[in-house]
């Protein structure tokens, strides 16, 4: 049996490292001062942290982009730029993080307080003080900051509804769910309108959010497997609060109180613990004729079943179609959830083994060579492109250093083997230069 799945697609971008600085020491009594440019600060990483207080991924529907700050540039006197703070993103317990492009699982976040670096901040570029050598004591070389990692992610949260809607078919459960959430269940005036559970994420005006399930309609005999009863009951046993929806207009010709007793009998027959869940009675269709009189009769019959010292179940008169009484119902539901402990969450049958891919690093290719239609040689590859973006192309010494790095990686030799000749154009990104054999 599948669980409900809440999903969200987001983008994360770690901060860029600060650029290194080219600077020289110039003080009155220090002739021929050497390099004095400091390193750039590291970029902030994007870190996911588990918060057991979160129940849904609803917050990611409103905020889909997460970008950490960049590190500051290096300064004179060899001082490093300030590193950027990491961006902490809170996620619910049980969140699975996938790479949206490959579909691979990056990590499973299962423990409260667990942290995972989802996008690593870029390294700060080195200042010219780092490149001083006996042969070149005054280098005019500094690195640009390394770009931070950028990822498109898909978050999945296997969840079970906090709140379950129970009641006879056609009492208005699907309509209620569609009104208070973004769920779009199929709605019709016939029995077993809902044949599979529908899930909606509900947010109250006070900012609380919870998952509400509209479950397959229940009939007498469900606990013995009649109709869709077994499927219904296996879902409802995992909820923490039950909203018992009753058609107070009696439009189907049934007595509202008899409906209430019948449904509770099925819940008790299937599993005694179901009756331990706090239950709110939702008196629906109060905009219809006869509803007010039926509600009075219902309350009278209900009170007769309780001792004078017992607390009666809460009753909220509403009309889903007319949008009446919904705000008070949702606030009361959120308050009840806050003080209700969790019941059974998972069966062994619910747990799906799937291959997980942890970490980000795959085998990194140094470079690749292709040729455009205009005969330009095109260089690409993660390592090569990272070296390129960290090279300050406005300084000759930095360009010469980059050329030596390419030679050391074997790029020159590979171009010769592919047939490159002296004077051929070579392109990296938007930067073009001539190949010198």
Curated annotation (Swiss-Prot):
NCBIfam families: Obg_CgtA (TIGR02729), Obg_CgtA_exten (TIGR03595), PRK12296.1 (NF008954), PRK12297.1 (NF008955), PRK12299.1 (NF008956), small_GTP (TIGR00231). This is GTPase Obg. It comes from Streptococcus pyogenes serotype M6 (strain ATCC BAA-946 / MGAS10394). One of its GO terms (biological process) is ribosome biogenesis. The keyword Transmembrane does not apply. It comes from the Bacteria. InterPro entries: G_OBG, GTP-bd, GTP-bd_Obg/CgtA, GTP-bd_prot_GTP1/OBG_C_sf, GTP1-OBG_CS, GTP1_OBG_dom, GTP1_OBG_dom_sf, OBG_GTPase. Residues 2-160 form the Obg domain. One of its GO terms (molecular function) is GTP binding.
